[in-house]
Structure formats: C-alpha cells, structure tokens
Design a protein with these regions (language model features):
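Surface-exposed acidic/polar loop and edge beta-strand patches at domain peripheries
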Residues: 1-291
C-alpha cells in the first residue's frame, strides 16, 4: 500500500488489488475512483459532477451550519469545497490513507474539521468525518460522490440494481424545516427493500423531473447495495448515519442517468455538536465483482 503526492496537491491512494483513489487537498474532493471489473480491467467508476451546470453541483466536502434560534431555520454554507486543507498522507501494509484538516471561523464560531480517507487491501474505501467547535451548534458534514459502476461512463446507470432497507422517505427534500413530513415507502416507487432496477424507478409516471434529492431514513441495517451486471461490479455502502440523500446527475439537462449519489447525512436538523466533544461519523464503500 502506498500514497503519493503530485504537484497539483492531489494524493493517490492505491492497494494491492488494483484500486486507486485520487483526492484533492482543495475541498477534499475525490477526483478519480479506479476499480477493476470482473475481468480485472481498471476503470473509473465516478461521474464528474463538476460537468453539471444546471443545477451546479460543487465537487468536494459539503458543510452547513443551521441556526434555529428564531423558530425558523437559517442555513450557512461553509463552502468547504473551496477550502484548502492541510494534508497528511500515511500508509501501512494493509492500507493507505490521507488526513485532511482545517480550522474555520464563522460569526465567532470556531470549527475544527478532520477528514480521514482510508483505502484497504480488502477493497474498502472508508471516510471518517470529525469536527469540534468552541460552542454548541448544528453542523452537517458530508462528501457527495456520484457513481457509475459501468466504468469510464460506458453506459448509463439505468441498468444498475439498487437495494436498501428504508421504510420512510421525504421527496423531494424540502426547504429546511424543523419537523419535516415523512412518507412511507411501502406501495410507492421509493420502496427498494426487495431491490429494483433503476430504469423502472426513473420511468415511473409520477416523476416530471429527476427523482433526485430524496431523503431515505434507514430501517434496521444502514446498508446500500448496488450491482452493475455487465462489469460485474458490486458496491455496498454502510454508514453510521441514520439516512442518506439519493441524487442523480448527468452531462445534459434532458436526462439524469449518468451518475447516482448516496450522500449519507444526519436526519436534517437532528445533529448537534457539543463544543469540544468531537462529532464523528463514518461511511464505508466496499467493492467486489461477480463472474
């Protein structure tokens, strides 16, 4: 296992099984994610969301502060995707990794952010988020990544099979509210408990636009499974967060089939950081193939 830095402040993590992850110290974005297919051919399984212009999707870490003192919700975007982090690469026999850290001040609130990226020889990419503050506040941290398991964008995501256990959802994710309205997935196109192919989801007549930005609350196991049959790639995502936002994106405004994102995040405004006590959560992506 090793990690390398290039002149553009990008760091490459790789393992002994052909996986590579390229990370930028500016914004903490994952620039490339190389995963071999069932025949051992390495390909990039990421969709570059920076190519999307309408609506614009920032590439990199997302951080937001929420103020509810007035009875309504006020959101402050920390613009972490534009922040230059201090980077510390490391490696062991079993894994390679990168630690990104930064401290920012917003209206007298000092926030220390520590982000850890770990690639293991078991083909797991682990993202660990930590933050401390000088006073209690509501803060969300996440790293949206858009996937296309066909590899090098050879095909759309319509033939991806998706499965996860969720009995409640919010669609679309509303303007911020303290008490959002949850709906039951049972009997709706949003029910993925038994697994569904994405083209059936996208073609449902209830969608007049992209079925993006749907929040799902996990039921029982916080695990998502995705399979692409042609390449044989499997991806599972497991997180310590209670739910995630499902989003889709594409190069062109007339379709939304190029990439899919599972942005693990707390249930809207339920997260509260208590000063010097670190807020911590973790998301793990595991990759394998079928023959």
């Amino acid at each position: 296992m090793n990690s390398q830095k290039d002149q553009s402040a990008r760091y490459c993590l790789n393992n002994d099984r052909g996986m590579e992850v390229e990370i930028a110290s500016k914004g903490g974005s994952i620039e490339r994610l190389i995963v071999p297919d069932r025949n051992g051919h390495p390909e990039n399984i990421m969709f570059d969301c920076s190519l999307v212009t309408v609506p614009a999707i920032p590439r990199g870490l997302s951080g937001r502060l929420y103020d509810t003192s007035s009875g309504s919700v006020h959101e402050i975007d920390l613009a972490l995707h534009q922040l230059l982090f201090t980077a510390e690469p490391f490696s062991t026999i079993q894994e390679s990794g990168l630690r990104l850290s930064a401290e920012i001040s917003v209206n007298g609130q000092v926030i220390a952010i520590d982000m850890l990226y770990v690639l293991t020889n078991n083909n797991q990419l682990i993202l660990r988020y930590a933050a401390t503050t000088n006073q209690p506040l509501r803060l969300s941290l996440s790293l949206p990544v858009f996937f296309n398991l066909s590899g090098n964008l050879k095909a759309s995501i319509t033939k991806h099979d998706l499965k996860f256990s969720s009995s409640c959802f919010i669609h679309p994710v509303p303007a911020l509210s303290i008490n959002p309205c949850l709906q039951q997935t049972k009997g709706t196109p949003f029910d993925f408990r038994l697994g569904r192919r994405l083209n059936r989801f996208f073609l449902d007549k209830m969608f007049s636009r992209s079925p993006a930005d749907t929040y799902y609350l996990f039921h029982q196991q916080p695990v998502i499974s995705v399979h692409e049959a042609v390449s044989g790639r499997w991806m599972t995502m497991e997180t310590s967060q209670p739910g995630f936002v499902l989003s889709t994106a594409a190069h062109h405004t007339d379709t939304f089939f190029s990439g899919i994102c599972f942005d693990s995040t707390d249930f809207l405004l339920s997260s509260l950081i208590n000063g010097p006590i670190p807020s911590f959560h973790e998301t793990t992506y595991s990759f394998s193939t079928t023959y």
